[in-house]
Amino acid sequence: MKKRISRIICTLLCCAPIAISAQTSEKITSPVNLYKEGKELFQEKNYAAAIPALKAFVKQKPTASLLQDAEYMLVSSAYELKDKNRIELLRKYLDRYPDTPYANRIYSLLASCYFYEGKYDEALALFNSTRLDLLGNEERDDRTYQLATCYMKTDNLKEAAIWFETLRASSPKYAKDCSYYLAYIRYTQKRYDEALKDFLPLQDDPKYKELVPYYIAEIYAIKKNYDKAQIVAQNYLSAYPNNEHAAEMYRILGDAYYHFGQYHQAVEAFTGYLDRDHSAPRRDALYMLGLSYYQTKVYSKAAEMLGQVTTANDALTQNAY
């Protein structure tokens, strides 16, 4: 009898860990815990880790409201992780849940996807279906920046400027980017004083210091402020001799030397421009180079350069003759 009781006790003791393990495993993989785990990881922006738990939860056939939430987190995670099928997943979610409370954010994510693909018209159409003011602050600013850029890329500079101004006033993160694009827009509109006002503070900014000096020097030259144009161009060429804007800086430098009457230096600078610019050179630069050669008595070169200017029936051609 004692032996029988001992065997029963041993059997129970051996089975107990298995039963406890099964209960623990069931507790961990229960729908409630899977949902809780996936949601916590999603809120922590640990999207890759959130996906397995959320997918496992969806397989448990939960209630409609929780299923909608879980699938929202899944498609949002696909967006954040740049899943190649993210556009399709986001659109399918909207088709499945047309009345979802997450529709506004889903539209904003779709717009962002098209923005990154360079499909600016498609992005704009979706942004127009979105209330950006209902997004979280960080995401609102990101989408506003994308919206403004879309307008600029589609040549709607008026709307682009409005949105860049709006964002600059509210977002320290994007303030300098907005200032640059606003300055660029003003530059293209020939509103040079306004452009210069926004370009100047960006001269020492790490992101823009190799870019804005060209516009600053060009504006100075356009406004016939040749001494400042010369200084900016010389400093730039000393710092960034191989930059893509170096050719234009040599042209601006040649422009300044020409108007100072320093024709030898003008020839040298304009030659630097032609050596680096492999596109069609500007006719006004060829004209000034031709006259600089003439002033330095290199008449054959003067004739060659001025001959290249007479390709259109305009004042520059008349002056070249």
Q: What is each residue range found by the language model?
A:
Residues 2-8, 20-321:
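Acidic, polar-rich low-complexity tracts and alpha-helical solenoid repeat scaffolds
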Residues 10-17:
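Bacterial N-terminal signal peptides
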